Design a protein with these regions (language model features):
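Domain-level signal for Mg2+-assisted phosphodiester chemistry and nucleotide/NA-binding surfaces
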Residues: 1-86, 107-110, 115, 123, ...
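General alpha-helical segment detector with a strong preference for membrane-spanning helices
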Residues: 15-17, 103, 137
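Acidic beta-strand-to-loop metal/phosphate-binding motif
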Residues: 39, 91-98, 105, 109, ...
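Short hydrophobic alpha-helical runs that function as membrane-insertion/retention elements
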Residues: 60-62, 94, 117-118, 136-137
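Short beta->alpha linker loops
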Residues: 72, 97-100, 120-123
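A short acidic, glycine/proline-enriched capping/turn motif at secondary-structure boundaries
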Residues: 84, 100-102
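Class I SAM-dependent methyltransferase SAM-binding "motif I" and its flanking Rossmann-like core
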Residues: 128, 137-138
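Receiver (REC) domain switch/active-site residues of two-component response regulators
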Residues: 133
Length: 138
């Protein structure tokens, strides 16, 4: 299936980006990527990821840890996804994460008429996998 306007949203806190270029190349074969955003706490162990993402044309969104081990990355990604859905006419959303918290978002996007592709680790939850139209291991 080919798409005209693809949104790529990366949960950098919960994603291995060792194959970022291959991931982007694959998504590009599916259509035109018009939005690239990545979310995470870049001040800690994600500094190298931030640089790689920026070099690949991603807008990097920074969220501090409010309490140890927790930040607003997930909710920020979800808010942006819903905001983008209602402001523009995108036909596909790509969510790169292994976090099952994105299951309700993937279902909401599907119910709103867009095609949802998930990318994540092989141990990503069945709920998130099944919430997407398709899911690929990275």
């Amino acid at each position: 299936m080919k798409f005209h306007r693809i949104v790529v949203l990366i949960d950098a806190d919960n994603t291995n980006l060792a194959n970022l270029e291959k991931l982007i190349q694959y998504i590009s074969t599916r259509g035109r990527i018009v939005v690239k955003r990545a979310y995470g706490n870049w001040s800690e162990n994600l500094k190298d990821k931030k640089s790689a993402l920026q070099q690949s044309g991603f807008k990097t969104e920074h969220y501090f840890n409010c309490v140890p081990g927790k930040n607003a990355t997930d909710i920020a990604l979800a808010i942006d996804a819903v905001d983008l859905l209602h402001k523009n006419s995108y036909d596909s959303f790509v969510i790169v994460s292994s976090d099952s918290d994105f299951t309700p978002l993937s279902i909401y996007l599907k119910e709103s008429g867009v095609y949802v592709i998930g990318f994540g680790k092989s141990n990503a939850s069945e709920a998130f996998r099944n919430g997407c139209d398709e899911f690929k291991d990275i």
